[in-house]
């Protein structure tokens, strides 16, 4: 480039004699050689005089040439920069495509599979070589002398031909089955776990619901038959079943029903519209999946699905734990009934013919399913007294119930020992309820003294230790009076709140259950998910409802307060009517 400028400077050609750089081919610096074709005009004496003049037009021509050259070089640099950016973008896109292609084809697993196949092939080749080597050694060891070999050559050829044909025929017939019985090492394949996704979790729950729908429909139809939802259908089913059992056709009847169900499913799969159900099916609205969800909607969706999964797993765990506790003699009086029934069935199967045993079992099952269960479902009190399977199932405990019973027994023992050690001088004429009410105490003292109540007022058994909460009195403006932390108790006639900060009883709150005008569940902070952890109680003396918030066992407390409130109000109403 400098040499080109030197040529321009020392030759001193005019502007028209230069090669226009803007019209030159777009090439790089390496492609441009020093020999640029220039027009060599004839110089006249006048031109030579102009060239000798340092301040003449030659200087202007050189300046304009340098500017044009710089401009073209700047354009070339911009063009090269653009090509470089395009190349980088193409490289980035190609890398993304390569990554997606690797994820789709799962090249790593294919490579591992290829390595395993190579190792297996090498092992097989080694085994084949060992077998061939052993055969050659055996042939060398069993090779007879030359005289005997010539004598028995024809017989051996015939025997070898016959044995080879026999081996070939045997391999063609049974070789595949022999290969199937060959032992191979078990391959431990590790399944890749999918990451947690709200959309995936919701879709799995919907799939589970759709998959369990045939089973739930079958159970609903059986329940409808037992409940005589359709009188004609239940009567026909009862008559057909009892006749089949009486004539010994119960098992063929069930097999025929299974074949009929599969035939109907085949026709439905072929496009036939066949809908038969005792209970009319209720079509649930299908919610279209939302593509764009906000963070709060995703969080609420995950909470809803987690709640459904929690309830489903809880029911399944209850069933499995009850079955386990039935067979593990957790409650001996219940398992003893099952034990005696199994012994009776065993002895009956040993001494009576199977036809008679099957007839008795089938008749009992039909009468129990169609008649006895119908009466028991219509009369719950009769069922609670005489339905043995129902009583056994309801009385079977789950593992959490066993833990609660054990903890309650331990606390009861501690209470009895403490009452014996600390209250030896209780009056003998008092009953158990009066004694418990008189000496029931909180952390700050006796219960009736703290709330200025009568001695027979004591907390109910459900809330003997109270529920921790915070009282929000929205009628007050001071922060100390607006929110108070403490414990909530429920007695037979009062709702008592004990403040945990002050020792004076002025900060405690006592509300008569009769004075309550409204009670409902309350959500203190609407931005948080869920149904809240508060209870709102309205009374005539307060302008705004009193809110007991931050209760962990909110539902239990609400049910207790509501049931006691209904009990007190109904008793007061009946007393007023009389």
UniProtKB/Swiss-Prot annotation:
One of its GO biological process terms is: apoptotic process
Q: Where in this protein does the record put region Disordered?
A: 23-58, 136-159, 415-435
* Subunit description: Interacts with RTN4 (isoform B).
The record's listing under Pfam families reads: GRAM
Sum up the protein's function in the record's words: Plays a role as a mediator of E2F1-induced apoptosis in the absence of p53/TP53. Plays a role as a mediator of E2F1-induced apoptosis in the absence of p53/TP53. Inhibits TLR9 response to nucelic acids and regulates TLR9-mediated innate immune response.
SMART domains to which the protein is assigned, alphabetical: GRAM (SM00568)
Where is it located? Mitochondrion membrane; Endoplasmic reticulum membrane
Highest taxon of the lineage:
Eukaryota
Q: Cite the entry's keywords alphabetically.
A: Apoptosis, Coiled coil, Endoplasmic reticulum, Membrane, Mitochondrion, Phosphoprotein, Transmembrane, Transmembrane helix
Spans through the membrane: 240-260, 334-354, 356-376
Q: Signal peptide: which range, if any? A: none
- Listed InterPro entries: GRAM (IPR004182), GRAMDC4 (IPR037847), GRAMDC4_PH-GRAM (IPR037845), PH-like_dom_sf (IPR011993)
Q: Where would one find coiled-coil regions in this protein?
A: 83-143
Residue numbers of Phosphoserine PTMs:
24, 28
Regarding tissue, the record states:
Expressed in lung and in primary lung squamous cell carcinoma (LSCC).
Q: What is this protein called?
A: GRAM domain-containing protein 4
What membrane topology does the UniProt entry give?
A: Multi-pass membrane protein
Record's note on what induces expression = Up-regulated in the mitochondria by E2F1 after addition of 4-hydroxytamoxifen (at protein level).
């Amino acid at each position: 480039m400098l040499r080109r400028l030197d040529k321009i400077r020392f030759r001193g050609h005019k502007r028209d004699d230069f090669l226009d750089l803007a019209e030159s081919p777009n090439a790089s610096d390496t492609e441009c050689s020093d020999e640029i074709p220039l027009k060599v005009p004839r110089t006249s004496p006048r031109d030579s005089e102009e060239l000798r003049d340092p301040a003449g037009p030659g200087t202007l021509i050189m300046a304009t040439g340098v500017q044009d050259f710089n401009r073209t070089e700047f354009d070339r640099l911009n063009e090269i920069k653009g090509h470089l950016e395009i190349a980088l973008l193409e490289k980035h896109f190609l890398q993304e495509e390569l990554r997606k292609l690797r994820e789709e084809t799962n090249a790593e697993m294919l490579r591992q599979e290829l390595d395993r196949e190579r190792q297996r092939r090498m092992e097989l080749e080694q085994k084949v070589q060992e077998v061939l080597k052993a055969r050659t050694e055996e042939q060398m060891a069993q090779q007879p002398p030359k005289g005997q070999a010539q004598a028995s050559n024809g017989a051996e050829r015939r025997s070898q031909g016959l044995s080879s044909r026999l081996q070939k025929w045997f391999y063609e017939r049974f070789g595949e089955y022999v290969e199937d019985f060959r032992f191979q090492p078990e391959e431990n394949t590790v399944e890749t776990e999918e990451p947690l996704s709200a959309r995936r979790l919701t879709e799995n729950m919907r799939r589970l619901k759709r998959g369990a729908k045939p089973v739930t429909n079958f159970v609903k139809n059986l329940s409808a038959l037992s409940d005589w939802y359709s009188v004609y259908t239940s009567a026909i089913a009862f008559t057909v079943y009892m006749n089949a059992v009486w004539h010994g056709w119960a098992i063929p009847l069930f097999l025929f029903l299974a074949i009929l169900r599969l035939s109907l499913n085949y026709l439905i799969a072929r496009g036939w519209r066949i809908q038969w159900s005792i209970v009319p099916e209720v079509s649930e609205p299908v919610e279209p999946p939302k593509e764009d969800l906000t963070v709060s909607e995703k969080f609420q969706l995950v909470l809803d699905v987690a709640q459904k999964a929690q309830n489903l797993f809880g029911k399944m765990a209850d069933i499995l734990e009850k079955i386990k506790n039935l067979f593990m003699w957790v409650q001996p009086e219940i398992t003893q009934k099952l034990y005696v029934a199994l012994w009776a069935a065993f002895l009956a199967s040993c001494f009576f013919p199977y036809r008679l045993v099957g007839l008795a079992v089938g008749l009992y099952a039909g009468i129990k399913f169609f008649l006895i269960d119908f009466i028991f479902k219509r009369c719950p009190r009769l069922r609670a007294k005489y339905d043995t399977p129902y009583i056994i199932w309801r009385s079977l405990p789950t593992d959490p119930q066993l833990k609660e019973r054990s903890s309650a027994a331990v606390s009861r023992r501690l209470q009895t020992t403490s009452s014996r050690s600390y209250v030896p001088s209780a009056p003998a004429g008092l009953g158990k309820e009066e004694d418990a009410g008189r000496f029931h105490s909180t952390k700050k003292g006796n219960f009736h003294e703290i709330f200025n109540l009568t001695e027979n007022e004591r907390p109910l058994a459900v809330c003997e230790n109270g529920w921790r909460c915070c009282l929000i009195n929205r009628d007050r403006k001071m922060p100390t009076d607006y929110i108070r932390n403490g414990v909530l108790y429920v007695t037979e006639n009062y709702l008592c709140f004990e403040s945990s900060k002050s020792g004076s009883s002025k900060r405690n709150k006592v509300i008569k259950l009769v004075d309550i005008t409204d009670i409902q569940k309350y959500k203190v902070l609407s931005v948080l998910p869920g149904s809240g952890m508060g209870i709102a109680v309205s009374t005539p003396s307060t302008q705004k409802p009193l809110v007991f918030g931050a209760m962990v066992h909110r539902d239990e407390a609400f049910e207790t307060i509501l049931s006691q409130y209904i009990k007190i109000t109904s008793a007061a109403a009946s007393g007023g009517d009389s």
